[in-house]
Amino acid sequence: MNHDPAETRDTAAAPLADTESPSPVSPELTPHPAPAAQDIDTATAELTVDEDDEARLPEIEDDSAEVADGPLAVGRAAIEQAVRLAPTSPGVYRMLNAAHDVLYVGKAKNVKKRLSSYARPTGHVMRIARMIAATVTVEIISTSTETEALLLEANLIKQLRPRFNVLLRDDKSFPYILITGDHWAPQILKHRGAQSRPGRYFGPFASVGAVNRTITALQRAFLVRSCTDSFFESRTRPCLLYQIRRCSGPCTGEVDFPGYTELVREAKDFLSGRSRAVKQELAVEMEKASNELEFETAALYRDRLAALSAIQSQQGINPRTVEEADVFAIYQEGGYSCVEVFFFRTGQNWGNRAYFPRAEKSFTPEEVLASFLAQFYDDKPPPKLILLSHDIEDCALLADALCIKADRKVEISTPKRGEKKELVAHALTNAREALGRKLADTATQTRLLQGLATTLGLPKPPQRIEVYDNSHIQGTNAVGAMIVAGPDGFIKNQYRKFNIRSEGLTPGDDYAMMREVLERRFKRLAAAKAEGEAAKPNDDETPQWPDLVIIDGGRGQLNAARGVLTELGLDAEVTLLGVAKGPDRDAGRETLFMPEREAIKLEPRDPVLYFIQRLRDEAHRFVIGSHRKLRKKDIREAGLQEIPGIGPSRKRALLHHFGTLKEIERASLGDLGKVPGISAESARRIFDFFHPGPG
C-alpha cells in the first residue's frame, strides 16, 4: 500500500493487467488465472527441498548517497507534466526511467494530490530523491475505487518488480492435502494450484515436506489409499502399502465399502479439527478389541492412535481459541527484514515459513508489512482472520480488498492481549531467529568466498559461481546440469538441466557432453551480453554472468571447457576450475586444476576445499536427480524391460514381490536378490540401473 512520500513513506500492493498507455484506463477487476493444478501421488512423489531453503537475503542498496540537483530538477519536471493531466480520483501510477524500466508503482485515493507531493523541491528522503531523479515518464491508470487501486497496485508490483518498491520474493503457491470426491474409494494426495478437482482440501501447509510427513502419518492412522485411479483399477492383489499397514486395500476388497467410507470420514474429521473425538473413537475400539481378546485388531488401533499423536507432536502449538488465521510478524536488523508467517486451520498449526522481502533500509516495519501483505494475498485466498505484529496504515482498506477477493468477511487485527497476542509473539520470536540464522549463514558464506578468491588468485570474491556436471548410463538418457551459488548460498531457482541433443556421440564421451552443455549455455549468454542484457541482474539480484565456472573433472574436462569458451571468444572473461576426485574417489583428496597453472592440492580439512566439495556434490545431486527423471519416463513408456536382461516374466516377479515400481527402485541389493527368479547378477543390474554412479 502507498503512503505519502512527504512523510517518508512508500508502498506496494495489487492486481491486474498492465497497460502501456499513460491515459486513464479503468481495469477490470478479474482474478488471476489460476495455475494448473498439480495432483501428486505420494507413493511416487520425491521429497523436495524445503521451500525455506531457497529464501535468500536481498541486496540492500545504500540509500544515504546525495542526489545531484540537475537530475532532481529533470525528474520533478517530468512529474509536474504528469500532474497537469492526472485525475483527482483513485488510481495507480507508475514511474519509469529513460530505458522504460518501471522504477515504482504506487496507488492513491487522489492521484493528482499524490503526484504533486513528489514535485516538491525539498523534503524527500534519499530513497525518494533517487527515484525522482531517475524518473522521465509517469503513467496513470484510473480505478473506480481506492480498493481497486490497492488490488491493482499489488498485482503490478509482483508482475513488474519495480526497484523502489518493497518486493515479496520466493513466492510460491502453497501445497494442500486433497481427499478426492470423484471416486467411490477416495484418494489422499498432495495438491498445488487451482482447486478444481472434486473433494475436500485441507491447508495451506507451509512446505511440501510438512504435507509429505502429514500424509504418511494419515495413511498409517486411517489407511486411506494414495495410489492413482488407474493404478487402483489395475490391481488384482494388494500392493506393498497394504502389507506395511499404510492402506486398507479397497482395490481388491480387503476392506468393504462401508468400512472404507468410515476410514475416510475419520480422516476428514481429524483434518477438520475434530481430532479429540476421532482419538476417543479409536481408543474405544482398541479397548473393545482387547476385551474380546482380538489382540491383533487392538494392536492395529494402537498403531493408528500413535500415528495421530505423531502428527500433533509435529504441529507444535495448536491454539484453543483461533480456528482459522494467518499470523504475520516482522523483524528488522542490519537493514534486512524477515516476515514470519504461521498458518492455522481448523484449530491446527499447518506450519510456518520465513520470507525476506526486498526493501531499502529507510522502510519501517509497518511499511514493509503492509506492502508484503497486499502482494502475499494477490494470488492466495485469505483466511477469516489475519493477525499482525505491527499496526499498518490503511488496514481497513486492505481488509475491504481481501473481502472482495474472498467474497466474505476478512478481519485484520494487531492483538494486544490473550492467546492471539501469544501467537503473534511466537511468530515474532521465529522471525528474529530466522533472520539471525540467515545473517550468520551469509557471513559464513562471505568468508568462504573470500577464502576461495585467495586460494584461486581471483581479483575479488565471486558473486556467481556456476558448477557443471553430467550423468548417463552407457550414453543413454544423457543429461547435463548447472547449479548456481553466490553470497547467500545455493540459488536454486537458477539451476538448469540440459538434455543432451547431439547425435552420434560415443557412449560415455563425457568431454563431448560437457562441450554441448557449455556451448548452449554460453552462446545464449554471449548473445544476451551483446545486446546489453546479460549485465542486468534478474529478479533476485543475481548477476547473470559467472565469475567462476567449476567443472566436475580433471585436466581433460577443463581443457574441453576451455576450448568451448575460446571458440566463443570468452576465455578471457570466465575463470575456469576443474575438480578431480582423489584416489578411490576419496573426499578430501581432490586436485584442483586451472588453465596454465600447476595443480592445486589443499589440506583435507581446509574450509575452502570443503566448500568446493559442497558445490560439486550439489551439482552431482541435481544432475543425478535430472537423470533419474528421464529414466523414469523411459520406464513408464517401456516398462522394466528397459533394464538389460529383464523380460516379461522377471518384470511380473518383481512387481508381484514389491507391488509398485517405486518400491523396486527403493529396494536394496539384498532385497532384489530375494525375488524368485532374480539372480545375483540380475539384482545387481537392476540396482545399478536405479542407482547409477556419476557421468
From Swiss-Prot:
It comes from the Bacteria. Keywords: Cytoplasm, DNA damage, DNA excision, DNA repair, Excision nuclease, SOS response. GO terms for biological process: nucleotide-excision repair; SOS response. Residues 88-166 form the GIY-YIG domain. The keyword Heme does not apply. GO terms for molecular function: DNA binding; excinuclease ABC activity. The keyword DNA damage applies. It is found in: Cytoplasm. Its main location: cytoplasm. It holds the Pfam family GIY-YIG. PANTHER family: UVRABC SYSTEM PROTEIN C, UVRC/OXIDOREDUCTASE. Interacts with UvrB in an incision complex. This is UvrABC system protein C. It comes from Rhodopseudomonas palustris (strain HaA2).
